[in-house]
């Protein structure tokens, strides 16, 4: 008699296990890699992505592209996550890390199909990654921090390598210098949020400028603003979160008055409350008043009469950066405005940049800060420029903290590939095949660089293998001559951290996907499955 089957999972649950689902997961990761494959390197193409709301984004950055893709496959999401983590940790190498993870999986796919146990693959990969990381640390070149000129040269080269694959690669020398200047202005903590990037449409890219201090766009202002001075030396700055404006009652207030005098007394009281606040600000000695909330026309004219400058509705992040740079603290009341809570800077001025007016605070005593003002044409182009600069800034920060570099352009990957191939020949058994597969997967980076530039990849890789076998460990792809070259001599440098991070993240992701032996998808509940488009605010579900 047949035993009764035990039904454990809900009806409609999709469960797949064994080798077929593992192969399916590997194939899904290949599809993700295909999406960013062509963006790698200085001859990489850009992607134009339009989201559900019709907003267009042009980008070459692997992490940005993967964020904008609406990936639903659970295994493929892992690759999106490692690209995001690489972006957050080191800023560059996001496309490389996705390609490496997908290529590791591609190389082990035949072994998986033949039934090799996933744990053997994982063990081999962990060994290979450890060997590769140790090799990078061993051959990386360290630049002495004491020699400031040399260190600066190193940082500029690293920034130029990061920018060479971006839309602004034509101006990479100009922006590399700007990025290094910006990071050098910061204090030892190198806080990323102390570098502000503001975009002003119009003008050429070369008109972009670096301001040693805080700069933000002039806020909306009321009549009387034009009377205020636009430049101060050594002013005191009041940072407020206070509304300086006469407004209608927020709540449904009800006041019963019997005579005109009663009504007048209420009106006078409202004015007196406002004037009382303004007087306290004036007596505090502040010359520049910034508030997160609106500053109305009465207050604007009051300050103008007393040679004071004010700006209301200042964005919170700009107010916080001003506070961190100039000192002082943001006050929610004007009753305790003493010199301790006021900020200071050497010069405050308002200047015209393109069609916009900007407020500048320079010579800030508390924290070193700076602002990059970008100029350019189309909005999408400027957004991509901002993303490119973010990557370059992250790379320069990493290079300052870890001052060892390796050659880019596929050189370090070819050297690691040769090293692991030689190592694999010294060990017996299945590990030999798997470490050999890992070594072959590393060649995807130089191969893809060649493919994206339209070169004959097989020919160039053969030349590279031969040169690395003869001991030319820094030889990589030379995009300009369609040949190979010593990329260390050509100053194609990257911080060693970028490569170490990319290898470990890609290897871990590959191991994670190989170790999954069953995928169970719960059915979507019937309520969720119904079209939710009609539900907005106040239109709940029908019960």
Swiss-Prot record:
Any GO CC annotation of this UniProt entry: microtubule
EC number(s) reported in the record: 3.6.1.-
Location of cross-link Glycyl lysine isopeptide (Lys-Gly) (interchain with G-Cter in SUMO2): 430
Binding site for Mg(2+): 92
Annotated positions of the Omega-N-methylarginine modification: 535
Major place of residence: cytoplasm
Residue ranges of the region described as Disordered: 524-543
Catalytically driven reaction(s): ATP + H2O = ADP + phosphate + H(+)
N-acetylmethionine modified-residue sites: 1
An example Gene Ontology molecular-function term: ATP-dependent protein folding chaperone
Subcellular location(s) per record: Cytoplasm
Highest rank taxon of the organism: Eukaryota
Record GO biological process: binding of sperm to zona pellucida; chaperone mediated protein folding independent of cofactor; positive regulation of telomere maintenance via telomerase; protein folding; protein stabilization
Amino acids binding ATP: 41, 93, 96, 398, 409, 499
Disulfide bonds: none
Keyword ATP-binding part of the UniProt annotation: yes
Keyword Metal-binding: yes
Residues that coordinate or bind ADP: 41, 93-96, 164-165, 409, 494, 499
Modified residues (N6-acetyllysine): 67, 250, 320
Assigned keywords, A-Z: Acetylation, ATP-binding, Chaperone, Cytoplasm, Hydrolase, Isopeptide bond, Magnesium, Metal-binding, Methylation, Nucleotide-binding, Ubl conjugation
InterPro entries named in the record: Chap_CCT_eta (IPR012720), Chaperone_TCP-1 (IPR017998), Chaperonin_TCP-1_CS (IPR002194), Cpn60/GroEL/TCP-1 (IPR002423), GroEL-like_apical_dom_sf (IPR027409), GROEL-like_equatorial_sf (IPR027413), TCP-1-like_intermed_sf (IPR027410), TCP-1_chaperonin (IPR053374)
Similarity-based family: Belongs to the TCP-1 chaperonin family.
Subunit architecture: Component of the chaperonin-containing T-complex (TRiC), a hexadecamer composed of two identical back-to-back stacked rings enclosing a protein folding chamber. Each ring is made up of eight different subunits: TCP1/CCT1, CCT2, CCT3, CCT4, CCT5, CCT6A/CCT6, CCT7, CCT8. Interacts with PACRG. Interacts with DLEC1.
Function: Component of the chaperonin-containing T-complex (TRiC), a molecular chaperone complex that assists the folding of actin, tubulin and other proteins upon ATP hydrolysis. The TRiC complex mediates the folding of WRAP53/TCAB1, thereby regulating telomere maintenance.
Listed name of the protein: T-complex protein 1 subunit eta
Organism per entry: Bos taurus (Bovine)
């Amino acid at each position: 008699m047949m035993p009764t089957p035990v039904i454990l999972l809900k009806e409609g649950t999709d469960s797949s296990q064994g080798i077929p689902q593992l192969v399916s997961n590997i194939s899904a990761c290949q599809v993700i890699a295909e999406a960013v494959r062509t963006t790698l390197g200085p001859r990489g193409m850009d992607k134009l992505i339009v989201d559900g709301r019709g907003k267009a984004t042009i980008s070459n950055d692997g992490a940005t592209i993967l964020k904008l893709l609406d990936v639903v496959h659970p295994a493929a999401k892992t690759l999106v996550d490692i690209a995001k983590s690489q972006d957050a940790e080191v800023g560059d190498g996001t496309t490389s890390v996705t390609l490496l993870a997908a290529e590791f999986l591609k190389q082990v796919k035949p072994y998986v199909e033949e039934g090799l146990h996933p744990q053997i693959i994982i063990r081999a990969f962990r060994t290979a990654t450890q060997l590769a990381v140790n090799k990078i640390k061993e051959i990386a070149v360290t630049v002495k921090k004491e020699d400031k000129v040399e260190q600066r040269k190193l940082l500029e080269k690293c920034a130029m390598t990061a920018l060479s694959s971006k839309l602004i690669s034509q101006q990479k020398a100009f922006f590399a210098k700007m990025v290094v200047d910006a990071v050098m202005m910061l204090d030892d903590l190198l806080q990323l949020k102390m570098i502000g990037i503001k975009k002003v449409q119009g003008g050429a890219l070369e008109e972009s400028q670096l301001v040693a201090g805080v700069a933000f766009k002039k806020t909306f202002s009321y009549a009387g603003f034009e009377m205020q001075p636009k430049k101060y030396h050594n002013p005191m700055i009041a940072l407020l979160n206070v509304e300086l404006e006469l407004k209608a009652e927020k709540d449904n207030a009800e006041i019963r008055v019997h005579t005109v005098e009663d009504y007048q007394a209420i009106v006078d009281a409202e004015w007196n409350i406002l004037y009382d606040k303004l007087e306290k600000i004036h007596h505090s000695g502040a010359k520049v008043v910034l508030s997160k909330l609106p500053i109305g026309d009465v207050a604007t004219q009051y300050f103008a009469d007393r040679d004071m400058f004010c700006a209301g509705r200042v964005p919170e992040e700009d107010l916080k950066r001003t506070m961190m740079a100039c000192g002082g603290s943001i006050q929610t009341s004007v009753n305790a405005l003493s010199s301790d809570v006021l900020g200071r800077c050497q010069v405050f001025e308002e200047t015209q940049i393109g069609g916009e007016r900007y407020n500048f605070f320079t010579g800030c005593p508390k924290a070193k800060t700076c602002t990059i003002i970008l100029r350019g044409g189309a909005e999408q182009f400027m957004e991509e420029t901002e993303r490119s600069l973010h990557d370059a800034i992250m790379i320069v920060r990493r290079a300052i903290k870890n001052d060892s570099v390796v050659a880019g352009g596929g050189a370090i990957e070819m050297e690691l590939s040769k090293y692991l191939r030689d190592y694999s020949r010294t060990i017996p058994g299945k590990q030999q095949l798997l470490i050999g597969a890992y070594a072959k997967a590393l060649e995807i980076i130089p191969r893809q660089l060649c493919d994206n530039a339209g070169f004959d990849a097989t020919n160039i890789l053969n030349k590279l293998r031969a040169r690395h076998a003869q001991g030319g460990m820094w030889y990589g792809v030379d995009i300009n001559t369609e040949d190979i070259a010593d990329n260390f001599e050509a100053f194609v440098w990257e911080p060693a951290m970028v490569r170490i991070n990319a290898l470990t993240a890609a290897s871990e992701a590959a191991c994670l996907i190989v170790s999954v032996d069953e995928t169970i998808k719960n059915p979507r509940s019937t309520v969720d499955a119904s079209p939710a488009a009609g539900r907005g605010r106040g239109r709940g579900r029908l019960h």
